[in-house]
């Protein structure tokens, strides 16, 4: 019993050789003796022991016919500094467990984390069938399934497939490989990065470079963790990596200069990563970096046309001013109208700051159209009202045609009505948008308002009623009225019930201002309602300024002429009235008063004593400012 403890203590302190071990065993010491759960062999074989003696190990094993072979901790042994490959072969031949997992990794993966692993050890273990990845997972492929067992409406050919199935993609391997463990541990002090080891591991399994962990390749981790050597980079590099992955690798490489002192950018690496470039991924990278120095370093190595890259960028899904500036510094030319029109073609490009930058800094091409097509901003379901309104204000001097229509006969105003954007509708109408357009399907701005107000939930319907009043208060033409009446009379709209009647009344009260007889003939059942409306019309006609009644002021005079009336006390008193039917006209009158005050304030701010503006007649100054700012 005493000899058992002596043998254990000698092994625990590594103070033993083969002869002393032999003597203790012959004196009755038992190599299978356990103390605190450890046998002498287990206590002896540890990474703390820098001098594991083969003859001691073999003696402790052979003396008990290798019954204690699995007390030899192979994980600990592989972490020691003096591994003997012949001893490993002997242990394996005697049946030591080599396929176990400890702390989530197998023995090959564990060995890869040591400071200077030997190729022969890798070969011995891998040839025994130990996997290069102990926890491999696979991706999946999405397979669309065409639905045939029920009827559905085919909105678009792209949606013929309405269900999906998933199959395992065995080519998409995911997990931490031996090579991964080798690479990520090389940044530790004293750890060697060997090209021979890397070449051997890749030759053992060619696909090892294509395993990913957390969606990143081994090259990504090499660039991130290690001091880069060209020859190792070339071995790990594969042009078949996705463009997205290559750009992530380039990003982490270029950012490394800010994380690590004395890190110098090797243009060979940059060029290699850009060599298999796709423009889309380069633009994605530029947007993700938001660092002008790094962006410029990429653009300097970009071998294709920077001008073409800029043209593609301004039609990209997200555009940043700093990226445009970097491209300009590298020789690209920004064109005011060409590039702003490209910018608008992408439906989600709506940053007023970008628009303002392009318009202020873009070059003008001689003999070009020099016009802006704002139509692409609008055919979308959701319009970002404040952003688009700011863009319209910026682009106002350059808009070619505010009433341009698309192939369906729809104008910008029509699209804004569909998206129930009140502020945009008011702006468009104030700036000359035609309320009388008719689409190729026969609908009008008034008609679509009525239909949407009838069909939508109450909260949205209220907005459409407000829009309907705004449009009608501008008085449509009789042709537009007749087309609207025909369109709404179509059975497919099913405008029935009290809600439909109230909407029709809103239309009638403005229609009679255009053609009284036609409306009375068309809607004879509403004569009583029309009579009530006439009382308010008569009131507006009775209130006059120098013989001009309020209806004439609101509907028959142009803006500069209206200015002569809006500050008149008679007009301002009338604008304070409350009508039952025509309050929208009162609202429009108050807007005129507010706009006039706004212009007067601007004139006062810039009209200094004796400057040229101050010498002009007030009416002329007001005319200049109204065209410039309203």
UniProtKB/Swiss-Prot annotation:
Coiled coil regions, renumbered to chain: none
Entry's induction text: Expressed in the early phase of the viral replicative cycle.
Keywords in alphabetical order: ANK repeat, Early protein, Host-virus interaction, Inhibition of host innate immune response by virus, Repeat, Viral immunoevasion
GO biological process: symbiont-mediated suppression of host innate immune response
Mapped ANK repeat ranges: 36-69, 70-100, 103-134, 174-210, 338-367, 408-437
SMART domains, per database record: ANK
Pfam families, per database record: Ank_3
SUPFAM superfamilies linked: Ankyrin repeat
PROSITE patterns named among the record's database cross-references: ANK_REP_REGION, ANK_REPEAT
Stated role: Plays a role in the inhibition of host immune repsonse by counteracting the action of interferons on early events in the viral replication cycle.
Family: Belongs to the orthopoxvirus OPG025 family.
Binding partners and assembly: Interacts with components of host SCF complex CUL1 and SKP1 and components of the cullin deneddylation/COP9 signalosome complex subunits COPS7A and COPS7B.
Name of the molecule in the record: Ankyrin repeat protein OPG025
Encoding gene (name): OPG025
């Amino acid at each position: 019993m005493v000899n058992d403890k002596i043998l254990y203590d000698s092994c625990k302190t590594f103070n033993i050789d083969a002869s002393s071990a032999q003597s203790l065993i012959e004196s009755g010491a038992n190599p299978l003796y356990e103390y605190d759960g450890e046998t002498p062999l287990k206590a002896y074989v540890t990474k703390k022991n820098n001098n594991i003696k083969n003859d001691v190990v073999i003696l402790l094993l052979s003396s008990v016919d290798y019954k204690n072979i699995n007390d030899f901790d192979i994980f600990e042994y592989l972490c020691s500094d003096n591994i003997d490959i012949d001893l490993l072969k002997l242990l394996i031949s005697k049946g030591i467990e080599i396929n176990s997992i400890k702390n989530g990794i197998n023995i090959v993966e564990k060995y890869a984390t040591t400071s200077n692993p030997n190729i022969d050890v890798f070969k011995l273990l891998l040839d025994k069938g130990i996997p290069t990845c102990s926890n491999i997972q696979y991706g999946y492929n999405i397979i669309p399934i065409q639905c045939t067992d029920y009827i559905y409406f085919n909105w678009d050919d792209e949606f013929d497939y309405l269900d999906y199935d998933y199959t395992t993609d065995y080519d998409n391997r995911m997990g931490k490989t031996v090579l991964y463990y080798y690479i990520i541990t090389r940044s530790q002090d004293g750890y060697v990065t060997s090209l021979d080891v890397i070449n051997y591991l890749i030759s053992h399994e060619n696909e090892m470079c294509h395993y990913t962990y957390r969606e990143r390749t081994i090259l990504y981790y090499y660039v991130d963790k290690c001091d880069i050597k060209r020859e190792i980079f070339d071995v790990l590099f594969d042009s078949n990596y996705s463009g997205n992955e290559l750009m992530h690798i380039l990003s982490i490489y270029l950012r490394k200069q800010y994380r690590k002192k004395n890190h110098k950018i090797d243009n060979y690496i940059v060029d290699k990563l850009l060599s298999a470039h796709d423009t889309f991924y380069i633009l994605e990278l530029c947007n993700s970096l938001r660092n002008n120095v790094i962006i410029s370093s990429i653009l300097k190595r970009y071998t294709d046309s920077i001008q073409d890259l800029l043209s593609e960028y301004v039609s990209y899904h997200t555009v940043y001013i700093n990226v445009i500036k970097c491209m300009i510094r590298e020789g690209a030319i920004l064109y005011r109208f060409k590039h702003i029109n490209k910018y608008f073609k992408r439906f989600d490009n709506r940053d007023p700051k970008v628009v303002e930058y392009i318009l202020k800094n873009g070059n003008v091409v001689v003999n070009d159209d020099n016009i802006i097509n704002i139509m692409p901003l609008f055919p979308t379901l959701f319009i970002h009202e404040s952003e688009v309104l700011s863009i319209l204000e910026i682009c106002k001097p350059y808009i070619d045609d505010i009433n341009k229509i698309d192939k369906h006969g729809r104008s910008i105003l029509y699209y804004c009505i569909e998206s129930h954007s009140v502020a945009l509708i008011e702006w468009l109408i104030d700036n000359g948008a035609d309320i009388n357009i008719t689409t190729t399907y026969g609908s009008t701005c008034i008609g679509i308002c009525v239909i949407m107000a009838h069909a939508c939930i109450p909260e949205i319907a209220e907005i459409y009623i407000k829009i309907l009043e705004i449009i009608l208060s501008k008085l449509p033409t009789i042709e537009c009225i007749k087309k609207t009446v025909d369109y709404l009379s179509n059975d497919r709209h099913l405008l029935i019930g009290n809600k439909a009647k109230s909407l029709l009344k809103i239309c009638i009260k403005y229609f009679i201002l255009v053609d009284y007889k036609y409306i009375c003939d068309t809607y004879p059942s509403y004569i009583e309602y029309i009579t009530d409306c006439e009382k308010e019309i008569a009131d507006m006609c009775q209130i006059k300024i120098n013989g001009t009644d309020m209806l004439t002021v609101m509907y028959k005079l142009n803006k500069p002429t209206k200015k002569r009336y809006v500050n008149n006390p008679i007009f301002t008193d009338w604008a304070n009235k409350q009508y039952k039917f025509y309050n929208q006209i009162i609202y429009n009158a108050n807007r005129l008063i507010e706009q006039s005050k706004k212009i007067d304030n601007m004139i006062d701010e810039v009209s200094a004593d004796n400057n040229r503006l101050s010498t002009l007649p007030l009416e002329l100054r007001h005319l200049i400012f109204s065209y410039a700012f309203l």
